[in-house]
């Protein structure tokens, strides 16, 4: 099992138990990684360093601006959840994948880095509504996962280019060509 140690100071648990004050006093940054059986067990932190970390956490929890935005302007009304039909059904406009869709997609062998966007879902629903085919809910989710995998990989993972922008000439010379 691999692990990452977040401090250069490492000590065995026996040494810490034997003389914890000396170990913590010598620690760079007030933090020591404590190992037990050649594996990281926990971190020992000085009270001063703990106070610094808590102050930093409190500072980061505060908003960066004193301007308060009205939340109701940004919250879209939540639609009432639609019950998933039993058995096979044709695609309908309010269809939604399950809340744990990303996890399910991983189980089906499709690693999705980001959740489905509203645009991707709308495109998927519009296509399959026109097709008129019927599938079970799980099958629809599998089709959505494959569709996202293919759609996102088609451009090397890059977002689609805007067709309305004017292209600019490339001034770089490819490797192997003389300029």
Swiss-Prot record:
<comment type="subunit">
    <text>Homooligomerizes. Interacts with PriB. Component of the replication restart primosome. Primosome assembly occurs via a 'hand-off' mechanism. PriA binds to replication forks, subsequently PriB then DnaT bind; DnaT then displaces ssDNA to generate the helicase loading substrate.</text>
</comment>
<dbReference type="GO" id="GO:0006269">
    <property type="term" value="P:DNA replication, synthesis of primer"/>
</dbReference>
<keyword id="KW-0238">DNA-binding</keyword>
<protein>
    <recommendedName>
        <fullName>Replication restart protein DnaT</fullName>
    </recommendedName>
</protein>
<comment type="function">
    <text>Involved in the restart of stalled replication forks, which reloads the replicative helicase on sites other than the origin of replication. Can function in multiple replication restart pathways. Displaces ssDNA from a PriB-ssDNA complex. Probably forms a spiral filament on ssDNA.</text>
</comment>
<dbReference type="GO" id="GO:1990077">
    <property type="term" value="C:primosome complex"/>
</dbReference>
<dbReference type="InterPro" id="IPR020917">
    <property type="entry name" value="DnaT"/>
</dbReference>
<feature type="region of interest" description="Disordered">
    <location>
        <begin position="156"/>
        <end position="179"/>
    </location>
</feature>
<keyword id="KW-0235">DNA replication</keyword>
<comment type="similarity">
    <text>Belongs to the DnaT family.</text>
</comment>
<dbReference type="InterPro" id="IPR040480">
    <property type="entry name" value="DnaT_DNA_bind"/>
</dbReference>
<keyword id="KW-0639">Primosome</keyword>
<dbReference type="Pfam" id="PF17948">
    <property type="entry name" value="DnaT"/>
</dbReference>
């Amino acid at each position: 099992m691999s692990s990452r140690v977040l401090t250069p100071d490492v000590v065995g648990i026996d040494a810490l138990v034997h003389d914890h004050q000396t170990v913590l006093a010598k620690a760079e940054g007030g933090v020591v990684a404590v190992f037990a059986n050649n594996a990281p067990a926990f971190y020992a932190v000085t009270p001063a360093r703990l106070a610094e970390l808590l102050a930093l956490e409190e500072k980061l929890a505060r908003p960066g601006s004193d301007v308060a935005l009205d939340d109701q302007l940004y919250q879209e009304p939540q639609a009432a959840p639609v019950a998933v039909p039993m058995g096979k059904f044709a695609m309908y406009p309010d269809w939604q994948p399950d809340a744990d869709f990303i996890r399910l997609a991983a189980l089906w062998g499709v690693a999705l880095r980001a959740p489905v966007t509203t645009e991707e879902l709308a495109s998927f629903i519009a296509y399959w509504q026109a097709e008129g085919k019927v599938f079970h809910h799980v099958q629809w989710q599998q089709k959505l996962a494959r569709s996202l995998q293919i759609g996102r990989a088609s451009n090397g993972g890059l977002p689609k280019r805007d067709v309305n922008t004017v292209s600019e000439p490339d001034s770089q010379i490819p490797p192997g060509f003389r300029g």
